[in-house]
Amino acid sequence: MNADVVIVGAGPAGIFTALEMIKKGSRQKIVMVEKGQPVEKRHCPKDKTKKCVNCKPYCHITTGFSGAGAFSDGKLSLSYEVGGDLPTLIGADLAQETIDYADQIYLEFGADEHIEGLGHEEERKEIRRRAIQAGLKLVDCPIRHMGTEKAQGIYLAIERYLQENGVEMYFGYECSNLILENEVCKGVAISDGKTDLEIYAKHTVVATGRRGADWLEKLCAEHNIAHAPGTVDIGVRVEVRNEVMEMVNRVLYESKLVGYPKPFKNKVRTFCQNPGGFVSQENYDNNLAVVNGHSYKDLKSDNTNLSILCSHNFSIPFNQPIAYAQKVGELTNMLANGQILVQRFGDILDGKRTWQKELAQSNIRPTLPDALAGDITAAMPYRAMTNIINFIQAMDYVVPGFAAYETLLYSPELKFYSNRVKMDTDFNTSLQGLHCLGDSSGWTRGLMMASVMGTLMGRKIAEEG
């Protein structure tokens, strides 16, 4: 099969590549390959089964059209300071300009016009003052919250728009390899387990998301595509009562706090805050169970959850950060019999495990009821655990009650975007004809910045004709 552009991965980066080409009037043939299912066929059975059933061949939360982010929460960060290192490659001004442009596209397809995190100047100053006292930095970032259920409708509208405008989509097909001729990428080989296909194209865009970060890292090694080990984030999902987070939830919606706690001074940050939200489980390759969180526009819980992530940057000779994070996750899963572990913060400080009956005695009712009470410190590396404990205690200055005895910590929370593919400002890799976008490229983190990268890629291809 021949095409002008083949896009591997139907997450925000891949979607916005195709979307921008169409908006620029390009008539080039676009083929999109996605190993998951279309939006309308993505359903997590846990709502009925009340526990994860390890869907095969892939978890519907992490795989399919719109990627993992849209099914976890659907938050669009509207500041270039949030979402990865892409601004260092393309420049802050272009990054912010394209964020504003992509945001308008989301609005066109039905995103809520309300923006969280604006106004409340005096209360924002008070939160910042507390953060400074605690040795933390508060990052200003307005948020457009689509919500898990609303995001699905928005991406369904985008999916249909792309199909109506001639984009060919191959769902259930996985990319097995690149097609190379004389050190030039000519396309991809794909398979659905029964049928093998080869798609030849002038431009091959790989945008496989966090789910595909490990696969892309191996591909780079196999084909000698210039890349470098990047950062991997290891942490926990914290859950507290809404009353504890009331001021931050109302004023900021999402508190973006960054610190460098002693003694290691690694970067530790909050991420993906969900007021009235729900803790969730995602399954990656080899049934690796990872915790996440999401919130709906309408359905609300009594709790707020957010992740606390510790960034790891390894030095020579170690160059397998993704494998390292996976091992941490596997060990935690082993202790929890394949499930997510949950522990009270006070029990961690007391050096004891948490028992299921103790959870029932707390003010907090876990929103991930099948998480197994236990001891996350038995699997979490000392460095990461120390950083997390010290960061939570610093957070208590900003949000009194955050470090309460009954505060819940779920593990493991892992972010697989560590491989950094070396590219120029037009997203050309060292392999001619190949472009790598989104979280799997190591340059972005989250829906909006991946959308920005796709927009710029689509614009460039359309201009070339």
Predicted regions and their residues:
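Dinucleotide-binding Rossmann-like beta1-alpha1 core, especially the glycine-rich loop
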Residues: 56-57, 64-117
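Residues forming the flavin
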Residues: 1-83, 124-129, 134-465
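Extended, charge- and Ser/Thr-rich helical segments
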Residues: 102-108, 118-121, 127-136
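Short catalytic-loop micro-motif centered on adjacent basic/acidic residues
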Residues: 114, 118, 204-207
